[in-house]
Amino acid sequence: MTQAVELRDSVDAGRLLAEAARIVRNQPYCWLATSSEAGGVRVRPMGKISFNTDAWTIHFITDGRSRKASDLRRTNNVSIVCGREADDAYIALIGTARLRENPSEVRERWKSAYNTYFPTELDKENAIFIEIGIDSIELWIRGFTPEPFGMHTTRLQRDAGGWRVTS
């Protein structure tokens, strides 16, 4: 029996999801990776504004004039990486981004905390929300993933029936 098969038999997807959620929830920042127009990868730190574990969505706010917004208009496949070095816990969330650019929706969802990043009226007019629906998760969490730590990835995939461990 391979280690991946043993892992599927011994690890509960719900337990892995709960641990992944705990790590993501407790990290104020994560790394968002998008594809550039030249085909490369762009990665930047982002502050989460919300994280919904029922729907497995993460929301960010950004400037609609930014390179990341341009990248997401071109292709909406993204990866988000969060980690907690003290716990040897690292999570890669893979999903699809949706830009929420409707000015009335942006005004409705606006919080005064965003004024720090969008200080002028012109900045506020160009603010947009990014909603990312997570479709798969890759985990490296000591005590949850196989040893030697970091050598094997534990993957969760979401389908119509919910989440399942795939490796």
In which residue ranges do the predicted regions lie?
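A short mixed-secondary-structure module that forms the rim of ligand-binding clefts
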Residues: I49-D87
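A generic structural signal for short beta-strands and their flanking turns/coil linkers
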Residues: N26-P28, R44, D54-W56, R74-V78, ...
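Short, basic/aromatic recognition patches
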Residues: E6-Y29
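A short, Trp-centered hydrophobic/proline-enriched beta-strand micro-motif
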Residues: R22-E37, V78-C82
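Short acidic (Asp/Glu) patches
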Residues: P45, T62-S66, T75-S79, E108-P119
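Histidine- and/or cysteine-centered catalytic micro-motif in compact active-site loops
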Residues: S35-E37, M46, D63-R65, G83-E85, ...
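Charged, gly/pro-rich active-site loop segments
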Residues: T2-A13, A92-S167
